Regions:
Chain B
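Signature of N-terminal electron-transfer/Fe-S-associated modules in redox systems
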Residues: 1-158
């Protein structure tokens, strides 16, 4: 392996990587604009110039690969390359490039959405010159729509072409191009062929300056007001890693978060703008009980009392059937608890089912990015923790028997067809755990208020078997209780258990005890990048049932 | 901009010949654009899309190429498209007064087409005929050692 | 001046010099026959290496050495591209060859292709060269008809297809990586090196890009031998060279002379001196991308790669533009700056932004609104676009392609060498206001 020196730091690097990659890995800052690890190298911004011993001129570090020198040609007797990133000439060069970039820039940071997370700002602050020498008139152009959700401010654009390369190399949709040449060149679209693809929003994320703007977020908030939470997307079973930006419990925007085992650097627009669905939904704000054809609020104590009255009867031998409807939208911890409730408390009186999976087109991009046809986040977890799931629950449920039903609601995406509607209507008592007045909630006798997907916490298992942490991006509102806790109370009430988990982590630990595939998959272990399941057991129903019992 | 909605090459054999000359389709871009422009005088959106389809790229990528080159026009030029070289050797030998003359006579500036559509004017960079400066180009022919008088005569004759 | 017998242009005055028969009548395609009969590809490379032929496009890189960069173990096809995208201001030598003796270049292409094992070659001809394109098309047609191109050329077993490819108006496509991108159907944004074209060029295959004049030298080298070629000119650069003379001279035109001829001989003997007997003020020795020379700097200066770089300028394309005492250097500098701003491809930050900035400042000075500070600024900006120029160590370019240097050198040299004229403009502005 080549041994190089960047400034004072000796580094052993993999042969063939670039100086910039080596520096990034070592957290040595070399400023850059046009380089992006997921895109081809163009070397045009000229910001990442460094001094390399033995080379007559400065080199762009993004396109300088590190090789091995024969022993007699090693620098200082041992190095394959000596790189300097802090010399006077390098500093002057950065200053010069920044001066060029700012010549025609409007310097309108006070009204720019990128302010606070702008590489033009940051590098100017760090490496730029303090005053402008440009006495001429600036080049001024109007903003334009590139697509339904993306606006370009040409005046702030530095022509790094990351966005153009993104549409060619990642989305493969090719909408963006460079129009004309020289200093009149600009990013453009061809007539009505606008930037409207499933990955379009990523160009806003990868734009290093405030040129590409989201119509969804424009002028809504300032970056420094926002709190960023590392979480995962719940809009399909890929489980892309995201950053959720919020202030005062309101979500403002979602960005992609890097995870090379899942989504690389990007997310799709379904996930990016999906959080609005929860804002638009008719929210449930308290546990509710049916009353005079409508609902009225009920306290948690009242709700549990109601559950006790309805369900504990079933424990006393009366021939009843308990139907549990589990959901692939819920966390592993909730599903684990749900499985315990059904299998350990109601035992053979219970039957667990689910509504049909919500599916849509599977979308594959040549770059490897994928949107799953399974538009629920945790089908794998559902199958792991409710291994005795009945596929044909509508047929299996015996006619004529008294039926009690406890359903974890899929949420706002769930629609009910007539068959399912009449199934739920035929229940003697229907408890629905949800956050919104969904079609299913409307049929309930009792609504238990659980968190929305942005409030949930716990693990999800994506379709590759990777266990990832769903981090709540906003905190729970007053009367909402975590799903696992509600189920725990259900167990304590009906099954006379004395479970006292105080956090989702405790449930997670217990879950690991009983399901070896999930052992040690605690938040502490999996962190923000997730870990694969252990695959100690396969989730065959029989084994699964043993694990529960 | 009124543009033809459809475009069809009138010489499909020529198109086939061009495509067959290159190891990949996209390399045929420039010759196909030249051919389309010869046919219609300029590159309509439909023509750009047609060429893009032939070489199997997105029309946006095709526009990326088209807009880079000064010899491709995306709007109609005059019947006689006058290109005056303004680079050094021509400038040293009187190119500026030629531009002034044409601008005044036809009431057009750089990039304009005269009202009757007969003359359009662009200032261009070095045409590689510096020994016979100043040089102008009308459509595809160069006219060398130009003077204002010579220019007027040439325009009359074509 | 020692007598020199023109080689490349010897027969161009003949009416049929551009036809196949015309070319054959004066010994054309004899080198090809000789090569196929007596030489292996490696021997051709050796001969060209021995001839010390350096590229005539501007950079002056040794042709044989360039050929040697092609990977020996590559399974990809090798391509040859003839660079006929002549667009350097003040340069019109390739155009002459294309017009008058296209077969000489074609013969050179076949020789070069044979040497590098290329079976598909391109001629990238400047879009504006319409007549030349027609002539070239005819020449290629004739060559195919007589089995000088196509399969099994002259029974040698060697196959070669030649495709003429027209550019569409972009100076930067004369740069080899810009040219390759353009040939691929893209905008002519020069691709970053490495990899170099000899390793990954056209369609990421090994590619050699050679200038028209360079290729036209090849038949003569094979015909008369490397030693003969080397004997022409000086140690520092051998062979015949086409010089273009334009601007304020009595006899502008292309003149063939050995490398290393005196610049003064070119201007005053070949070029016939200055119009109306005026005084010489300044001259571009190698197209507008070379640093300008003042009249007092040219005495004894020889036109070859090394002598000119010692004089802090370059041979470039050998486009000599002559300016007399009446020429306003501020306006010429503005003219040149405009050219580069118009032709900057816009890819690299310093070139895209800097060229237009220079035009704006120069225009302001020209309009009488400049200040002395502006003059210093021009120095700094040219340095920031093109790099600090140290001729002992080579150029310090700061952009992907040498365009940045091509802007910086001339603009800087104008302000450096004719500073008094710039100051006068500033002073005039001060007076007016």
């Amino acid at each position: 392996m080549p041994l190089i020196k960047i400034d004072d730091k000796e580094i052993e690097v993999e042969k063939g990587i670039t100086v910039l990659q080596a520096a990034i890995d070592e957290r040595i800052e070399i400023p850059y604009y046009c380089y992006h690890p997921a895109l081809s190298i163009v070397g045009s911004c000229r910001m990442c110039l460094v001094e390399i011993e033995g080379m007559p001129k400065l080199q762009v570090s993004c396109n300088t690969t590190i090789g091995e020198l024969p022993p007699e040609r090693k620098k200082d007797g041992k190095y394959d390359m000596i790189v300097r990133t802090q010399t006077e000439i390098v500093k002057r060069e950065r200053e010069n490039v920044l001066e060029f970039l700012l010549l025609n820039h409007p310097l309108d940071c006070p009204v720019c959405d990128q302010a606070g997370e702008c590489y033009l700002q940051d590098y100017s602050y760090k490496y730029g010159r303090a005053h402008s020498r440009f006495l001429e008139e600036k080049r001024v152009r109007k903003n334009e729509y590139l697509g339904s959700n993306v606006i370009i401010n040409h005046n702030r654009c530095i022509m790094c072409t990351r966005c153009v390369r993104f549409t060619r190399e990642i989305s493969g949709t090719n909408e963006l191009f460079v129009q004309a040449r020289g200093d009149v060149s600009k990013i453009s679209i061809f007539e009505d062929k606008s930037l409207d693809n499933m990955l379009a929003g990523n160009v806003i994320d990868i734009c290093p300056v405030g040129a590409l703007l989201s119509t969804d977020y424009i002028h809504k908030n300032r970056f420094w007001n926002l709190e960023a939470k590392k979480s995962i997307c719940t809009d399909c079973s890929v489980g892309c890693n995201i950053l959720v930006y919020s202030q005062n419990n309101r979500i403002y925007r979602l960005n992609a978060r890097e995870n090379h085992n899942v989504n690389g650097y990007f997310i799709c627009d379904i996930g990016r703008y999906g959080f609005h669905r929860y804002e638009d939904a008719e929210k449930v704000t308290s546990p509710l009980i049916r009353s005079d054809g409508g609902f009225k609020p009920i306290s948690w104590e009242g709700a549990l009392k109601e559950i006790y009255e309805q369900f504990s009867m079933s424990m006393s031998g009366e021939k009843q059937q308990i139907v549990g409807i589990a959901s692939p939208f819920h966390t592993n911890e909730s599903l684990f608890m749900f499985g315990r409730l059904m299998n350990n408390i109601f035992k053979d009186k219970s039957i667990i089912g689910k509504l049909p999976f919500i599916e849509d087109y599977e979308i594959h991009f040549d770059s490897g990015f994928r949107i799953s046809k399974d538009r629920s986040p945790n089908r794998k977890g559902l199958l792991d923790f409710c291994p005795n799931l009945e596929d044909e629950i509508l047929q299996k449920v015996k006619a004529g028997e008294v039926r009690l039903c406890y359903a974890l609601d899929d949420g706002v995406d769930r629609k009910l067809d007539e068959e399912w509607e009449s199934f739920f209507k035929s229940q003697r008592f229907l408890v629905v755990q949800t956050y919104a007045m969904t079609p299913l909630a409307k049929l309930a006798h009792l609504i238990l208020l659980g968190p929305s997907p942005m409030e949930r916490e716990g693990t999800m298992t994506n379709d590759q078997g990777r266990i990832q942490w769903l981090n709540p991006s906003v905190s729970l509102t007053n009367k909402t209780r975590p799903d696992w806790e509600i189920i725990m109370e259900f167990m304590n009430t009906v099954g006379k258990r004395e479970l006292k988990y105080t956090s989702v982590n405790e449930v997670n630990l217990e879950m690991g005890e009983r399901f070896p595939d999930y052992r040690g998959r605690t938040f502490f272990k999996i962190g923000y990048q997730g870990l694969p399941k252990k695959n100690i057991t396969t989730s065959r129903p029989s084994e699964g049932r043993q694990a529960i019992q | 901009m009124a543009q033809n909605r459809t475009f069809k090459f009138t010489n499909p054999q020529r198109v086939e010949k061009i495509l067959s000359q290159y190891p990949d389709k996209r390399s045929a871009t420039l010759p196909l654009l030249h051919l389309a422009q010869e046919q219609e005088g300029y590159l309509t959106s439909a023509a750009i899309e047609a060429v893009a389809e032939l070489v199997e790229i997105h029309p946006g990528e095709m526009m990326d190429t088209v807009s880079f080159y000064t010899m491709f026009y995306t709007k109609p030029m005059g019947k006689n498209h006058v290109q005056v070289c303004q680079t050094l050797s021509c400038s040293l030998n009187g190119a500026d007064s030629l531009v002034d003359h044409i601008s005044e006579k036809y009431k057009i500036a750089h990039g304009d087409v005269s009202q009757d559509g007969k003359i359009s004017l662009v200032k261009v960079e070095c045409l590689g005929s510096c020994d016979t400066a100043p040089v102008i180009r009308i459509n595809d022919s160069n006219y060398e050692s130009m003077t204002v008088e010579k220019f007027d005569k040439i325009v009359e004759s074509i | 001046m020692a007598s020199f017998e023109p080689i490349l242009t010897r027969h161009i005055h003949r009416e049929d010099s551009h036809t196949l028969s015309g070319y054959k009548n004066v010994g054309g395609y004899k080198a090809l026959e000789k090569m196929f009969k007596t030489m292996a590809p490696d021997e051709v490379i050796e001969e060209v290496n021995a001839s010390n032929l350096r590229g005539r496009g501007g950079a002056g890189f040794p042709t044989g050495v360039k050929w040697g960069f092609i990977p020996k173990d590559s399974h990809k096809p090798t391509y040859l591209i003839c660079n006929a995208d002549e667009s350097e201001p003040g340069t019109f030598k390739d155009r002459l060859l294309l017009n008058k003796t296209p077969h000489m270049m074609l013969e050179g292409m076949i020789i070069s292709s044979y040497a590098i094992d290329c079976h598909l070659a391109f001629i990238y001809i400047r879009g504006e060269f319409y007549q030349e394109h027609k002539i070239l098309e005819k020449a290629v047609e004739e060559a195919y008809a007589t089995n000088l191109l196509g399969n099994d050329i002259l029974g040698s077993g060697f196959d070669l297809e030649v495709v003429i490819h027209r550019g569409a108006g972009a100076y930067i496509c004369g740069e080899e990586m810009g040219l390759i991108e353009s040939l691929e159907g893209k905008r002519g944004w020069p691709r970053i090196k490495p990899p170099f074209p000899a390793i990954e060029g056209y369609l990421r295959c090994p590619t050699i890009v050679s200038n028209v004049e360079t290729l036209a030298c090849l038949p003569h080298i094979l015909n008369r031998g490397a030693d003969w070629f080397k004997s022409i000119g000086s140690e520092k650069g051998s062979g015949p060279k086409l010089y273009c003379i334009s601007g304020r001279v009595n006899n502008p035109g292309v003149y063939e002379e050995p490398l290393g001829i005196l610049l003064t001989d070119l201007i005053f003997k070949r070029g016939g001196g200055l119009i109306d007997g005026r005084e010489l003020k300044a001259v571009f020795p190698g197209g507008s991308s070379s640093a300008i020379l003042r009249a007092d700097e040219i005495d004894g200066l020889r036109m070859d790669f090394d002598s000119l770089s010692a004089a802090k300028t370059m041979l470039g394309s050998a486009g000599i533009i002559v300016m007399d005492e009446t020429v306003d250097m501020v306006s010429v500098c503005l003219n040149i700056a405009r050219f580069y701003a118009h032709e900057s491809c816009g890819q690299c930050t310093p070139c895209r932004e800097g060229t237009t900035w220079l035009v704006k400042i120069l225009n302001r000075i020209y309009q009488g609104n400049g200040s002395l500070n502006d003059i210093d600024m021009i120095f700094e900006i040219t340095d920031n676009i093109g790099g600090l120029i140290d001729f002992s160590k080579g150029s310090f370019g700061k952009t992907i392609c040498p365009f940045g240097e091509a802007v910086a050198w001339p603009i800087r040299s104008f302000v450096e060498k004719f500073k008094d004229e710039f100051i006068a403009y500033v002073a005039k502005g001060v007076e007016v206001s």
